[in-house]
Amino acid sequence: MSALTSVSGFPRIGQNRELKKIIEAYWKGNTTLDEVRATAKELRAKHWKLQQAAGIDLIPSNDFSYYDQMLDTAILLNVIPQRYQRLAFENPEETLFAMGRGYQGEKGDVTALPMKKWFTTNYHYLVPEIDSATDIKLNSTKPFDEFNEAKALGITTKPVLIGPYTFLKLARNPQAEELDYDKGLVNAVAAVYAEVVAKFAELGVQWIQIDEPYLVLDKEPGDVELFKSLYAKILPAREGKVKVLLNTYFGHIADVYETVNLLGFDGIGLDLNEGKDENLAAVEKYGVAEKTTIFAGVINGRNIWRNNYAVSLGLVDALKQVTANVAVSTASSLLHVPFSTEGEDGLADDVRKHFAFAVQKLDELHEVAVLADASDDEKKASAELAANQALFDGTRVAADPAVAKRIASLTDADFVRQPARAERQKEQREALNLPLLPTTTIGSFPQTKEVRAERAKLRKGEITKAEYDEFMKNQIDACIKHQEEIGLDVLVHGEFERNDMVEYFGQNLNGFLFTKNAWVQSYGTRCVKPPIVWGDVSRANPITVEWSAYAQSRTDHVMKGMLTGPVTILNWSWPREDITHEQQTQQLALAIRDEVLDLEKAGIKVIQIDEAALREKLPLRKTDWHKKYLDWAIPAFRLVHSAVKPTTQIHTHMCYSEFNDIIKDIDAMDADVISFEASRGDLVVLDAIHDANFETEAGPGVYDIHSPRIPSEQEIEDRIYEILKKMDVEKVWINPDCGLKTRGNAETWPSLENLVAAAKAVRAKLAK
């Protein structure tokens, strides 16, 4: 007999990204919707059977999605804005894709829903829009269909839902500054969830998992009452036939645990990775309701390192001192880790044994559950426990003394750039001689099949390095020529040689490991393959200098060097767990600093250091923002560029994030120019820029590159005027909101032509 095991969620893209490939083929018209549905059904069955074979008791269903689970929840509740309903698609999947990607075709022209980061992960969710026209009602059978689908295979699953509290807190009203949680809205949402719970009870469901990750955030006035009022209406629908697990993750719920414990949930899921100390203290202080099971989230759903069984067992034992009702669970959905280490033969066995991807985490979960109920003698005799402990005894990788020496020699002066920004801006305007409202792009240009094929040929040894370089130079030449023709002011080389903005740098730094197939979903069908920080990081040789110098030699325009910043490299990698994030970021900062100075020596006058993921790992509770993150993340960025000349213009770029609350910290990065991804956020960041007297020049994105639609010149011109209402014209740059790598040339160049034309039109009007 072992403790009950529960998986919060499982990756849905497939071991070989089957879901991504079939959906993208459908978007291109190369397959049918029936084929998409068939592939999805095969994947669901495979994933359920894998979990069943691993001995998992509570296997999730309804964790699958074609695009995003928040989007699925919006559709479940009929939270579908009128602009999408008017498209009148025959198939619900088409409506879902239009909401996620936008639509431009014979049925109309609509933008996508806003997209934001899912808490502190690199996953993105679609933001539901609730307005006066929204008619909340049960609108989908997806959760029930997938439960029945698994049941037909002989597997009784645990349906998973995003909870009503989290859904409402993440939704927005596009017609108002804030969503009003009025009684009518709250009752309508609660009624749908109660109806869902009742239907599950009729179907013979034993457990329902309702995810409420928003509970781990700071509470605003009224939040606790909102939560209580929702569940006061939902929980009675159980009627004693079905159990409800309230699942929380990405932090602790110590401030509301007492309330949650008294509401009568059958299970409470606690994250014992990120919220370990606070959650344990709350359980010890307030106890556990008699009929409630605590689901101990001990298997990390956010990183790829092996679980330390001794630590996990200690956490389970601590809970057992309070209650006998303890289940063992993943700390969060396994959506955020790759599928399996199987097939990663590029990693040596003595390296690979330190990693656990989703499939391996199933085995870890089962083994921890068995050991949790074992006697002391059985634990001592356990080969699994001994083998696991051996992974953590001794030193995994030797430290690099040169890296340690360099960090120890840093002084306060290394983190401060001279002269002050206002003086630098004067010198840069004179040196660069750019027009008002200068136009540029964020860095990458579309990577065609031919570009990807050429990289693959080099990797397989089918072409020489010289042949590869010649091909890439031709790509750069064509990209530069096209940028010159449409009239962009600051050019880029296109980044054709880069597979990924993080992996590319990792491949050229000491201390990283790489996988063949460790893909994770970022948004929609977009997947990323993060590198692994294995040891101390340093730069062996220049990385980008040759390409940037070549590009500058091919044009009289200003050429922008393109780098990825240290915080983003760490946040979009699998970080080490044996040293702190601060230590790893400082190592990365010194490596990128060397590259910045070499670019400057090579004649590159504008250098962009992307910190796309800076906001991503900001702690969810404000009291932790500075002491646990910003106090070392911001100085790390300054360390990268502090030694350049005053005339060298330092740019940075930030992706899907909410910046308003840390705008002063962003200004403190001391960059000369920053581009924000802002087009899907309705430019709300402009108010923060205005109110904070933001000193950095800025380019809020004027169109959304994550949608295939082409913005008109007038649309972009209107956007520019919106920006100018809040910003000094001399501090405004005009750019798309992100890199163009994942777009096609067919939409990229017309969009940029409209961008340049709009900027010129505004300049002309301002000159009158």
From Swiss-Prot:
Record-annotated active site: 706
Entry keyword set: Amino-acid biosynthesis, Metal-binding, Methionine biosynthesis, Methyltransferase, Repeat, Transferase, Zinc
UniProt key word Metal-binding: yes
Molecular function in Gene Ontology: 5-methyltetrahydropteroyltriglutamate-homocysteine S-methyltransferase activity; zinc ion binding
Enzyme class: transferase
Pfam family, one: Meth_synt_2
InterPro entries, A to Z: Cbl-indep_Met_Synth_N, Cobalamin-indep_Met_synthase, Met_Synth_C/arc, UROD/MetE-like_sf
Entry binding sites for Zn(2+): 653, 655, 677, 738
Cofactor(s) needed: Zn(2+)
Domain of life: Bacteria
Cofactor note: Binds 1 zinc ion per subunit.
Positions bound to L-homocysteine: 442-444, 495, 610
Reaction equation(s) it catalyzes: 5-methyltetrahydropteroyltri-L-glutamate + L-homocysteine = tetrahydropteroyltri-L-glutamate + L-methionine
Positions contributing to 5-methyltetrahydropteroyltri-L-glutamate binding: 17-20, 117, 526-527, 572, 616
Pathway: Amino-acid biosynthesis; L-methionine biosynthesis via de novo pathway; L-methionine from L-homocysteine (MetE route): step 1/1
EC identifiers of the protein: 2.1.1.14
Gene3D superfamilies, per the entry: 3.20.20.210
Residues where L-methionine binds: 442-444, 495, 610
Gene Ontology terms describing biological process: methionine biosynthetic process; methylation
Task of the protein: Catalyzes the transfer of a methyl group from 5-methyltetrahydrofolate to homocysteine resulting in methionine formation.
Record-linked HAMAP family: Meth_synth
Family the entry assigns: Belongs to the vitamin-B12 independent methionine synthase family.
Name of protein: 5-methyltetrahydropteroyltriglutamate--homocysteine methyltransferase
